[in-house]
Amino acid sequence: MSVKVIIFDFDGTLADTLEALVIITNRLAVEFGYKQTAPEELAQIRNLSSREIVKQSGISIFKLPFLLKKVKLALHNDIQKLSPILGIKEALTNLKNEGNRLGILTSNSEENVSVFLRKHGLEDLFSFIYSGTSLFGKHKVIRKFMKQNNLNTEEVIYVGDETRDIESSKKINIKVIAVSWGFNSREALAKHNPDFLIHKPCELIEVIASLQKIVS
């Protein structure tokens, strides 16, 4: 396997957005008719898959796109206050310097991501940002990107913090690195059998290097 492109999720993988997202979704709970998340419930929710969370919340699947839109707008007001995951900038810089092409695929807005990257001096590390994907539609965007760039499944790897990131990667047969520092717990991620499960950003360097070594 010769990895050429590493695609990253944004929320929870690159940016520490968990607390902000909980506050925002709690604020919108009454409007969209779902239960708020109490602080003591967060650990249990992190053990659920994305689909289980949607089901448990009781929100109508038809309201999800409208909720996502409002969450993005609300997050825009907080984006300047958010921080990168500790150690992620160093890992990204190393991966970029090794000749990898880095990109972002997110259900957040491109504007939010761009503002965040500029604020933290990360914008030059990424070649592309694809935004606006549905909660469970990332695999379609990745497949289209691969086709447009003549990439095969062995040349692309996805990095994400949620069970749905693993599901999307498996649907199109690309390898996935699950990271336990974001939304879903390591136990929830492990149940979905990612190709790699890591717990610190520096481990990204080791995983990608090991894959390149297999080829050489």
Residue spans of the language-model regions?
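Glycine-rich phosphate-binding loop signature in dinucleotide/nucleotide-binding domains
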Residues: 1, 98-100, 149-155, 211, ...
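N-terminal helical cap/lid subdomain that shapes the substrate entry/recognition surface
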Residues: 3-89
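Conserved Lys-Pro-Asp/Glu-containing loop-to-beta segment of HAD-superfamily phosphomonoesterases
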Residues: 5, 139-166
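Conserved H-loop
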Residues: 35, 60, 122-127, 152, ...
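A short, structured active-site edge motif that brings together acidic residues
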Residues: 41-42, 123-136
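Short beta->alpha linker loops
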Residues: 45, 83-87, 108, 133-134, ...
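Short, acidic loop-to-helix structural element flanking the phosphoryl-transfer center
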Residues: 77-104, 110-114
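Acidic, Mg2+-coordinating phosphoryl-transfer loop and its flanking beta/alpha structural elements
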Residues: 157-197
